[in-house]
Amino acid sequence: MPRPYKCRRISEIPKVAYYKPAGIPLSMLEENQLSTEEAEALRLKDLLGLEQAQAALQMNISRPTFQRMLYSARYKVADALLNGKALRIEGGVFEIDARPCCQRQTPSCQPDPPKQT
């Protein structure tokens, strides 16, 4: 019997979800898909500079799982940058902060609208 799936936690959905090389029509590009969890792993480790153990704890996953996710994300980003591919950030099964675990396409996973003051 396989182990139960552990829901991954992210702080927010990335504000920009698509990148492509300038000057090349989208129809001529190959595309790499980066999951939302992989983008969060990159953010925690490479942007915020957290240690893998800290980042894994924040995402509610084991350190080896975090490491595999980070390597996968780095490979996809490097492939897109060096080989002129588009990069789409979407998909995955995760929870945003304390919201229930779900897929990005469901309404409960969308970011809260800004509060008006």
UniProtKB/Swiss-Prot annotation:
Coiled coil: none annotated. Disulfide bonds: none annotated. PANTHER family: PTHR37478, UPF0251 PROTEIN TK0562. InterPro entries: RNA_pol_sigma_r3/r4-like (IPR013324), UPF0251 (IPR002852), WH-like_DNA-bd_sf (IPR036388). It holds the Pfam family DUF134. This is UPF0251 protein DehaBAV1_0135. Belongs to the UPF0251 family. Gene3D superfamilies: Winged helix-like DNA-binding domain superfamily/Winged helix DNA-binding domain. Transmembrane segments: none annotated.
